[in-house]
Regions:
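Conserved GTP-binding G-domain of TRAFAC-class P-loop NTPases and closely related GTPase folds
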Residues: 3-9, 89-164, 257-259, 263-271, ...
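Conserved substrate/cofactor phosphate-moiety recognition/catalytic segment
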Residues: 6, 11-69
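Short, acidic loop-to-helix structural element flanking the phosphoryl-transfer center
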Residues: 181-212, 220-235, 261-267
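Substrate-recognition/cap helix-loop segment adjacent to the acidic, metal-dependent catalytic center
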Residues: 208-211, 218-255, 272-275
Length: 320
């Protein structure tokens, strides 16, 4: 077999592990710091040894020129070509991949405190992706690569992902606050927005949509409201609507970026997708803020602004 060094690079959760499996099946020796430990220079030394027997594939993130240099140097030393496979998975797709992987492996969306104790390189806090984006340097032939190939990301859902849902923001979408704060801190402060019940019932009963809720509740982290009060407000909102909407909420605030559950991050969406095997292209997110729209985009949901959505008289044919 022809000797070569293949560096597979891209965001965490970009799909590198899936791609490297094809190379291993072909007889390539995989070198990965998450498996062997050590530094990139240690991997380079291992590559130096392994190349005596055949081709090598490496699949860590390799975000900058410095992180790739020692591996390329091994190729030059042995006059062996070094090929770069650059996974063009976007930041947003990598975020969703990370959340889906997390839910599939642990059954839940990990919280900031979980990342302090977990020992799995495939389960990482959101700051890892932001750091990669910050330090990333585009690979070039000038570095010493003999070839650079772009690998597009194509998301494919399994045949079990067939269900659809209406995902709803709460504050500003279903209700307003009559209290001193922008968001209700007690059920008595909830004022329902008009024309909500009828359309939601039509989507649920006539068109067969699940009704799910996704909300940011940073007041919990700020200390202006308790988690118990927030949940009482959700339950009272559902009671006023006459519906049992399953809701998930984020209690954290930014900065810092510490969780995947705060919209526009796709964590809550990933949780719903996995739990109910949703087909995102058949789902609709309804909200009133840019964060809601970005959340929908990252999850692959359709999006409608609350004012536009609740102006509908019935479920449109395209969504039946």
């Amino acid at each position: 077999m022809k000797k070569e060094i293949v560096i597979i690079m891209g965001y965490n959760a970009a799909g590198k592990s899936t791609l490297v499996e094809d190379f291993v099946k072909k007889g390539y020796k995989r070198l990965n710091r998450d498996v062997s430990g050590g530094t990139v220079d240690d991997l380079a030394k291992n590559a130096d040894i392994v190349l005596a027997h055949g081709p090598v594939v490496l699949d860590n993130t390799y975000p900058d020129v410095k992180s790739r240099a020692s591996i390329i140097a091994v190729g030059k030393k042995h006059n062996i070509p070094v090929r770069c496979l650059w996974l063009k998975t976007s930041f947003e797709d990598a975020q969703l991949n990370a959340c889906l992987r997390m839910v599939r492996k642990t059954g839940k969306l990990l919280q900031p405190e979980d990342f302090k104790t977990i020992n799995d390189p495939n389960l990482f806090p959101p700051v890892a992706l932001f750091h990669y984006r910050k330090i990333f340097q585009t690979p070039t032939l000038k570095e010493g690569f003999d070839q650079i190939e772009d690998v597009p990301f194509i998301r494919q859902w399994g045949p079990e992902y067939v269900n659809r849902a209406l995902i709803l923001d709460y504050d500003g979408t279903l209700r307003l606050s009559t209290g001193a704060q922008k968001y209700p801190s007690a059920p008595s402060e909830i004022q329902m927005l008009p024309n909500r019940n009828g359309l939601l019932k039509a989507f649920a009963k006539d068109a067969g949509y699940m009704l799910l809720g996704a909300s940011n509740q940073s007041g919990i982290a700020r200390g202006s409201v308790t988690a118990k009060a927030v949940e009482e407000c959700f339950e009272h909102t559902n009671k006023m609507l006459g519906m049992n909407i399953e809701y998930q909420y984020c209690p954290h605030r930014i900065p810092p970026v510490s969780c995947y559950c705060r919209k526009p991050h796709p964590g809550i969406g990933a949780l719903f997708i996995e739990k109910y095997k949703l087909n995102p292209s058949k789902c609709i997110m309804v909200g009133d803020m840019t964060t809601d729209e970005t959340f929908a985009e990252r999850c692959g949901f359709n999006y409608m602004d609350a004012e536009q959505f609740f102006a509908l008289k019935e479920v449109p044919l395209k969504w039946r």
